[in-house]
A protein has these predicted regions:
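PEST-like low-complexity, intrinsically disordered acidic/proline/serine-rich tracts
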Residues: 19-274
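Cleavable N-terminal signal peptides
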Residues: 7-8, 18
Length: 274
């Protein structure tokens, strides 16, 4: 097990709502069973305009089921699931790396991910946020969706006001890219491009380049479940697009806690690799 991976787990355990002293508040909009507990199997809430309401605090279901190795096998016809450390863990043959990208991935992995931006209190990429053990909060309005990430205090904007996705290179590259969203029935479809070059998709260092486009499909089959199918199309680093599924669960009656990565950071000077 990588030393850096264990450090991430230790940080996540300290920062998670279950381990922290933070007041809970029983929200009135949470569907509840007769015993007063949240009814996770209830239908998802809807907004005033009839769309699925994705508002809430969510955490990665795979990680909090206690799994650290390979993810569970997806049913036939569904995208493979991913893990905190390895986005390609559910693919039998791994990711379709181009030769240079595979070499970079191996170098990052063998170096204990010491150059991962997250390890240096820098922003994580979108895929890392999806699979990170720390929770995230979705705030949904008709024209804008904000995702607040507890890890490294990340803030992401998804514009749902009808604006087109800019061409790659037309705007300043961002850590989180530029995102626009639209609805296909009850599915929220988010397209993102204009990423910074040299990105990390996971802790092991699967590359993401400035030529990437990411498409996320958000669905909520019930109140308690959030599914995000993520398609990575990065012809600079991979020979073909690929799709993974991230399963998350809602954390009702809880909020994010303050997480200032640099406040107590003392490990960077001691991180080593090959």
């Amino acid at each position: 097990m990588m030393r850096s991976f264990l450090s991430f787990l230790e940080v996540a355990a300290i920062a998670s709502p279950a381990a922290a002293q933070w007041p809970s508040f029983a929200r009135k909009d949470v569907p509840r069973a007769t015993d007063g507990k949240p009814d996770f199997d209830a239908p998802p809430l809807r907004t005033a305009d009839g769309h699925i309401d994705f508002t809430g605090v969510f955490e990665n279901l795979w990680f909090y089921n206690g799994r650290i190795g390979r993810p569970p096998v997806s049913p036939p016809g569904e995208p493979p699931q991913t893990t905190f450390a390895e986005i390609g863990a559910g693919f039998k043959e791994g990711l379709p790396f181009r030769p240079w990208a595979r070499e970079l991935y191996q170098q990052r992995k063998e170096s204990n991910a010491k150059d991962n931006p997250d390890a240096h209190c820098l922003p994580m990429g979108l895929m890392q946020f999806h699979i990170h053990p720390q929770p995230r909060k979705i705030v949904q309005t008709p024209d804008l969706i904000i995702i607040l990430y507890e890890g490294n205090a990340g803030i992401r904007q998804i514009f749902t006001d009808g604006r087109p996705l800019p061409k790659n290179g037309d705007v300043q590259p961002w850590w989180y890219g530029y995102s626009t969203g639209h609805w296909e029935g009850d599915t929220l479809v988010v397209d993102t491009n204009n990423f910074r070059d040299g990105g990390w998709l996971d802790i092991n260092g699967s590359p993401l380049t400035d030529q990437a486009k990411m498409t996320e499909r958000y669905t909520r089959p019930n109140y308690g479940t959030l599914r995000v199918d993520v398609t990575i199309d990065d012809p600079k680093a991979y020979t073909a697009p690929f799709t993974v599924r991230v399963n998350q669960k809602i954390v009702p009656d809880e909020e994010l806690i303050e997480f200032i990565c640099a406040e107590n950071e003392r490990s960077t000077a001691h991180m080593v690799g090959k």
